């Protein structure tokens, strides 16, 4: 049997970018044959990627790419916060958002089919899953192209905002930061979704009914609650986060700036995170190990 040296492991890792232990196992299985070890790794890492693909991805990052009036905002998910800080994962997300801005794919499937570094995006993704050991997937994106100016703001890597505007760049950047902090659901009161208003109205009606007031007073209480809600969730009517003496609309008017629209992505929003029972997980791993050695 051929002795597996550190140099051999290092050479295989340089060729495949696979973890050290995986390289050593592959070389041992291949009895030192480098080409055979590469083939073994391709099979193993592909299998690893397939197993990971069914796992929940509720962590990740939001990436942005802006160039004057063209740009994109993209969320890429992984399983843990630790991997969301991995350099290879970050590079993959940034490569993907640039492709969205440049190539204008119709959807995530089209993005995965685009070429990237001599492979498709999906092939790069699968190799990254094999290397890192977690499921990774672009979740959604939005591309921007038109006559409006664009500005982006990333709060760390978990919240991303793109604002479409006309006017002053600094004012627009301030608005992007405000959006990340205050999370409005619409530009103006008229833009708030009807279903959101219906939910708020239902809650307001129940609360007002419990007051025991006459019907006409109850109706006024409900309408007052709705108007308060609309002001709180519409960007232009919110109190500006950097100056509580004025609304966002007043700040923009003073800066001669108009917001045409905005998009905000928050990592994992709407995804139900998997809740693991750690003790049960450890017990299952111990049982599996015992079975394997039995």
Curated annotation (Swiss-Prot):
CDD domains associated with the record: UBA_EF-Ts
GO molecular function, one term: translation elongation factor activity
Principal location: cytoplasm
S-S pairs: none
A family per Pfam: EF_TS
GO cellular component: cytoplasm
Residue span of region Involved in Mg(2+) ion dislocation from EF-Tu: 80-83
Key words of the record: Cytoplasm, Elongation factor, Protein biosynthesis
Localization terms from the record: Cytoplasm
Function: Associates with the EF-Tu.GDP complex and induces the exchange of GDP to GTP. It remains bound to the aminoacyl-tRNA.EF-Tu.GTP complex up to the GTP hydrolysis stage on the ribosome.
Family statement: Belongs to the EF-Ts family.
Protein name: Elongation factor Ts
Species the sequence originates in: Polynucleobacter necessarius subsp. necessarius (strain STIR1)
């Amino acid at each position: 049997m051929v002795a597996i040296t550190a140099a051999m492991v290092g050479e295989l890792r340089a060729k495949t970018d696979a973890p050290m232990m995986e390289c050593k196992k592959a070389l041992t299985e291949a009895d030192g044959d480098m080409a055979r070890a590469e083939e073994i790794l391709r099979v193993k890492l592909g299998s690893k990627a397939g197993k990971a693909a069914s796992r929940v991805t509720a962590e990740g990052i939001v990436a942005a790419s802006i160039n004057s009036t063209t740009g994109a905002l993209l969320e890429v998910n992984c399983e843990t916060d630790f991997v969301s800080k991995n350099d290879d994962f970050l590079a993959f997300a940034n490569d993907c958002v640039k492709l969205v801005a440049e190539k204008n794919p119709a959807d995530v499937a089209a993005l995965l089919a685009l070429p990237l570094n001599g492979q498709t995006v999906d092939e790069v993704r699968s190799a990254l899953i094999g290397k890192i050991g977690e499921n990774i997937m672009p979740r959604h994106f939005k591309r921007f192209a038109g006559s409006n100016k664009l500005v982006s703001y990333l709060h760390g890597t978990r919240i991303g905002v793109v604002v479409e505007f006309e006017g002053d760049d600094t004012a627009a950047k301030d608005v992007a930061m405000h959006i990340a902090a205050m999370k409005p659901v619409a530009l103006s009161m008229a833009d708030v979704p009807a279903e959101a208003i219906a939910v708020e109205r239902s809650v307001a009606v129940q609360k007002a009914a419990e007051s025991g007031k006459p019907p006409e007073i109850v109706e006024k209480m409900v309408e007052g609650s709705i108007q308060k809600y609309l002001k709180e969730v519409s960007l232009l009517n919110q109190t500006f986060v950097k100056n509580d003496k004025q609304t966002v609309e007043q700040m923009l008017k003073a800066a001669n700036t108009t917001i045409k629209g905005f998009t905000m992505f928050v990592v994992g929003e709407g995804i139900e995170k998997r809740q693991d029972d750690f003790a049960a997980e450890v017990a299952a791993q111990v049982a599996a190990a015992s079975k394997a050695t039995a």
